[in-house]
Amino acid sequence: MELKKILATRRSVRKYLDRQVEKEVLQRVVDMALSAPSSRNTRSTRLWVVTDKSQLATISQMRDYGAAFVKDAPAAILVMGDKDKSDLWLDNCAITATILQL
């Protein structure tokens, strides 16, 4: 698929089917996201896959707004940065998060 088409047809989903995402699918997504470039190749981004309903509910309450939909999701991938590995950890997280959104 062409990049232009991927960017033009990408969409956000806030309503989910009541079924699990296969572990293999989640692992492929994580592997692809972690292949994203990083500043000075520091690889400071960490991903945490959450499928536990109680943890998803807790995560959905971590912000005042904009995260409530997470409680109904079958899985979430949290993007975190290791401050000790790079002073540009936040930039690296943003790059990885962008790949995840595609």
Placement of each model-derived feature along the sequence:
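Acidic, surface-exposed loops and disordered segments
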Residues: 1-102
